């Protein structure tokens, strides 16, 4: 969620005032795009617990396994430790690790819903 804006202390009192405020953020219809986001929680089949980040059944191993499908790993090193895979990117889309351990696919900005369907199926 965005932080509240402190650009104006005067309340908007009319439709035209609101339109004038919002219009600069608009885009021509030819530039309109849509994108999808999907969040998925993982669970281990044997005990239904969430996966850890480490290990051969962990989240990092899952991300590394997706590299063979054309995803590029995003790696981060903390405090001089070896880099760890924390996300993936491909064609304007990304797979990221969310705070509760779920994975999020953020789709690319596409022209129509049919393109988003193709994106989620590949």
Question: How would you name each of these model-derived features?
Answer:
Residues 1-122:
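Terminal catalytic/cofactor-binding subdomain
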